[in-house]
Amino acid sequence: MDRRIFGLENEYGVTCVFRGQRRLSPDEVARYLFRRVVSWGRSSNVFLKNGARLYLDVGSHPEYATPECDSVPDLVTHDKAGERILEGLLVEAERRLREEGIAGDIHLFKNNTDSAGNSYGCHENYLVGRHGEFSKLADVLVPFLVSRQILCGAGKVLQTPRGAVYCISQRAEHIWESVSSATTRSRPIINTRDEPHADAERFRRLHVIVGDSNMSETTMLLKLGSTDLVLRMIEAGVMLRDMTLENPIRAIREVSHDMTCQRKIKLANGREVSALDIQREYYSKAVEFVERRGGDEVAKRVLDLWGRTLLAIETDDLELVAREIDWVTKYVLIERFRHKHGLSLASPRVAELDLKYHDIHRDRGLYYRMERAGLVERVTRDLDVFEAKSRPPQTTRARLRGEFIKRAQEKRRDFTVDWVHLKLNDQAQRTVLCKDPFRSVDDRVDKLIASM
């Protein structure tokens, strides 16, 4: 597929820290956060003018689903726009708390685990063709996704009975199946529930739920871009070596607990390889593929960072990618902090630092303090992120949805939308079905908008 539709869904952790006596549950905090949303959308599940979806997920986790994007840099921009939208809700909620005499700060964390051991996710969506066997696609992808965490893990200090350890991935401990139709109960690597949000005869939506939420824009670019390249190779019929894992669930934990990425994991055919070996195999094939087929600047940037990350791990020179790869950035930050203050990895101050890295408030979050200090690389520009808060991607179906919502709100018309339907809730109940996510211009939608 030369042009692909991408989407990201991020769930956020929420807490409220008080200096006073009164405490709020996550449910109550979520109500404060979404009060403004409910006031104009009459629901805590809404679509926005930029084509995105914002809602409260299971367990009072705010979730932001990006609009459909047809390039990885666009997707990174719209994911960051989601952070800014939620930060705006946070600031408004804190103002309301102060007005009601409740002292305290609300924190939103773009991470994947809380102190109670609960996990919430970052779900990646890739549009793929309906032709071909989905099981074969999954067979090739699972070893890639299990080992991909060495490129794009968010890092985590994990407290174990044997002491604290630094893990590469936050999500690895919470994955229980390779392929399944569940998302919360068994948490598979790939979710097979067949909801394409497009023409089901032509398309299928690959739903990957194994990845960590990323603060780093460059890590996000590598996560999405490398997966896209592997999908392109599969679609083009490139012969990839059989890397089927004997036990993917055991392997994903073993990889996460091994910062050298050299520990051997068993393949179904009896061979033993490391996560580094697996990634080297996919990377070398991707380099050949792009050299043969040609690639744009995004593909070249992805391959450059992919190769440098593998080299940094292989040579134990993590500083090579300390500005670009989340788990490395955070590890270097924690190690410097520990050595400066003489702390063990199990120190509560280290746990606090670990969490602060993921705070999306730009004045409080450690990642954003590093960004302001020029200590991390970027993909986006502030202006583009700001515009993406209210402007949908202009080359996908999201443009139609965004324009419809914008006009309906301006005209104070009652409407209902989802990923494929645009409906005016008037006497005629006029509805347009938009099954092609690549289509950004549609006469039927123009007429519906003009009729308001």
Swiss-Prot record:
Residues given in the record as Mg(2+) binding sites = 9, 55, 63
Q: Where does ATP bind?
A: 53, 66, 419
Give a GO biological-process term. Answer: proteasomal protein catabolic process
State what protein this is by name: Pup--protein ligase
Matching Pfam families: Pup_ligase (PF03136)
Q: What is its EC number?
A: 6.3.1.19
Record's superkingdom? Bacteria
Source organism per UniProt:
Frankia alni (strain DSM 45986 / CECT 9034 / ACN14a)
Q: Which HAMAP family would you find in this protein's record?
A: Pup_ligase
Keyword ATP-binding attributed? yes
Q: List the catalysed reactions.
A: ATP + [prokaryotic ubiquitin-like protein]-L-glutamate + [protein]-L-lysine = ADP + phosphate + N(6)-([prokaryotic ubiquitin-like protein]-gamma-L-glutamyl)-[protein]-L-lysine
Part of which pathway? Protein degradation; proteasomal Pup-dependent pathway; Protein modification; protein pupylation
Q: Name one GO molecular function term.
A: ligase activity, forming carbon-nitrogen bonds
Question: What are the UniProt keywords, alphabetically?
Answer: ATP-binding, Ligase, Magnesium, Metal-binding, Nucleotide-binding, Ubl conjugation pathway
Give the NCBIfam families listed for this entry.
Answer: pupylate_PafA
